[in-house]
Amino acid sequence: MRIILLGAPGAGKGTQAQFIMEKYGIPQISTGDMLRAAVKAQSELGRQAKALMDAGKLVTDELVIALAKERIKQDHCRNGFLLDGFPRTLPQADAMKEVGIAVDYVLEFAVPDSLIIDRIVGRRVHAPSGRVYHVKFNPPKQEGKDDVTGELLTSRKDDQEDTVRKRLVEYHQQTAPLIDYYRKEADAGNTRYFTLDGTRNVSEVSAELAAILG
């Protein structure tokens, strides 16, 4: 079972990725994880990636694809894998296809930008414990304070509205074209494409995923 998750930041991909990993026993593969593992293992690809990063340069699509190909050959990916945040661009998707990385399911989590902004901007965290609240959807018992310690809650820098809006613009420019790409791939019989309504509660989305994936 080889799966790609698509959706804007805040669309709920991370939560559902966890559900898929636990239910189906397949590993999640992210670009960051692949790079860190390759650098740590000091493989040839890892050394190339480290040289680029040390020089302050972006790791090339070719190198990322090569890392992905190397990673999915490993034993723990024998039953499949879950790609989150990759491919991010059309050239990456094309390159994946060219090197023979097949995908069984592409799952898109659709959520309007206005709700994503609401979801992210309203997040509050208790930094020492990692507990997360939301001013509207999961408020603390006492406004602005952690339920357990009573300490003040804070907003992450990445959760500021202007930052979220910038990330959404970037998503629509770079990643949204993948939606058309994979819909066409599904029409051609190369994968199966499903759009899930990410505005629903977590358990409803998980139930639909279980019905799709079997």
Curated annotation (Swiss-Prot):
Q: What are the GO cellular component annotations?
A: cytoplasm
Q: What is its EC number?
A: 2.7.4.3
Report if keyword Glycosyltransferase is assigned.
Answer: no
Q: GO molecular-function annotation terms?
A: adenylate kinase activity; ATP binding
PROSITE patterns under this entry? ADENYLATE_KINASE
Keyword Endoplasmic reticulum included in the entry's annotation: no
**Which intervals of the chain are annotated as region LID?**
122-159
Residues that, per the record, bind ATP: 10-15, 123, 132-133, 200
Which GO BP terms, alphabetically?
AMP salvage
Provide the residue span(s) of the region labelled NMP.
30-59
Gene3D superfamilies attached to this UniProt entry: P-loop containing nucleotide triphosphate hydrolases
Where AMP is bound, by residue?
31, 36, 57-59, 85-88, 92, 156, 167
Subcellular localization is given as: Cytoplasm
The enzyme class is transferase
Please list which residues make up the signal peptide. none
Q: Pathway it acts in?
A: Purine metabolism; AMP biosynthesis via salvage pathway; AMP from ADP: step 1/1
Q: Which UniProt keywords apply?
A: ATP-binding, Cytoplasm, Kinase, Nucleotide biosynthesis, Nucleotide-binding, Transferase
Q: Catalysed reaction per UniProt? A: AMP + ATP = 2 ADP
Q: What is the role of this chain? A: Catalyzes the reversible transfer of the terminal phosphate group between ATP and AMP. Plays an important role in cellular energy homeostasis and in adenine nucleotide metabolism.
Subunit info here reads: Monomer.
According to its UniProt record, which protein family does this protein belong to?
A: Belongs to the adenylate kinase family.
Domain commentary: Consists of three domains, a large central CORE domain and two small peripheral domains, NMPbind and LID, which undergo movements during catalysis. The LID domain closes over the site of phosphoryl transfer upon ATP binding. Assembling and dissambling the active center during each catalytic cycle provides an effective means to prevent ATP hydrolysis.
Q: What is this protein called?
A: Adenylate kinase
- Protein's organism: Sodalis glossinidius (strain morsitans)
